[in-house]
Amino acid sequence: MKCEGFSQITDLADYLDNNRLIAHYCAIVVPYRVRIVIPASEMWEEGEERPDYVLQNMVGATVDLIIIKVEREGNFAIGSRRLANRSQRYFFAHREDLRSIGARVKCRMLAVGPRRCLVDCYGHDLDITQREMRYASIPDLRNEYHPGMEIDCIVKMFDPDNDKLEISIKETEVNPFFGAEQRHPVGSRRLAVISGKYGGGVFCNLPDGVVCMCNYSYQHEDADFMVGEHVMLIVQRYENEKLQMYGKIMNKW
């Protein structure tokens, strides 16, 4: 069910049980014209709670839930995503075709930030960094992804004893580095887009998805270039162990 919004209202579950009012964020789902409220306490497993701003960024996300209470006078119901996720994790753990290493499964975007996102994969809430999203560098994930998206991923590791799951989204595609040495020989000049800066280096995306780690030619400095600008670079070397191309930025283009 799609999360339609959130509200800083009282924790309804606690109010109905104990007649106590507690200010708390709640997710709101409206399937079939019936409002279902998911208190923050029913969104996450104990010990895995997320900050309120994560819940605020989940508008549009698709979530599973179990109805735990119906308030007929108030015309709403209370749902638990936490309990629904337990059921999903049990299902995943008992399906060999889903949990085996290398299996291709689906995950759903819950919240997206500039450099990382939160996804749900069969009841497992997983933080995924930009490096695991795509081989190409992405300046801001929010320009490419949004809550509610369903995308493919690869199971990297599953520990049934501790219920731990690791996935990779980028490995559903072929690494563009393979064959890059033939497509972009050392000494060749290529047009690229600056996608980020880190630790004195500059990440440049080539049109075929290869990322080239660059520095500047002697006549330029960091302030001369901005993320998103097109540049001309020269390929200098490859490190096959790191699957990395290196080059030097010559000028803007």
Language-model-detected regions and their locations in the chain:
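Single-stranded RNA-binding regions, centering on S1/OB-family and related RNA-binding modules
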Residues: M1-W253
